[in-house]
Amino acid sequence: TINVEGTDKAHSYDMPFSAVHVIVPKERTEEALIAARDAGARGVTIMEAHGMGLSEMDNFYNRLHASATDSNLMFITKTKNVDNIIKSVLTKLDITGEGQGLTFAYPVSHIKGLRLKIDDI
C-alpha cells in the first residue's frame, strides 16, 4: 500500500521497487546522502554498521563488541532510480577499493507504509 502525500488516499500500485544499500565510513555519510538525493532518492534509513575483512575473522568475538565505524544507508526507491543512485554515489565519493564503501541493490515487494508524491506515481 502506497500513501499519496497530501491526501488521505492509500492505494495498491503495481510498481517495481528496490532497496539500495550504501555502506560508507561514518565521516562520508553526508556526502553519500547528498549524492543519492541528487540522483533521485527521496528517503533513507540510516543504520550504524561495522565491517570486517576475512583476515579479521580470527578474532571475531572481539570484533562483535567494536563500535560502529560505518553507516549503512538504505533507500527504498522505484527500481528505475537504482542505477542513477548507485552511479552517483560511486562517482561522487570515488569508491574504488576495499574499505572505501560498498553499494548493492535488490528488488523488494509487499511494501506497506511508503509515502510518495503524486508526481512520483
Regions inferred by a protein language model and the residue ranges of each:
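Positively charged, small/polar-rich N-terminal and surface patches that mediate targeting and assembly
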Residues: T1-I121
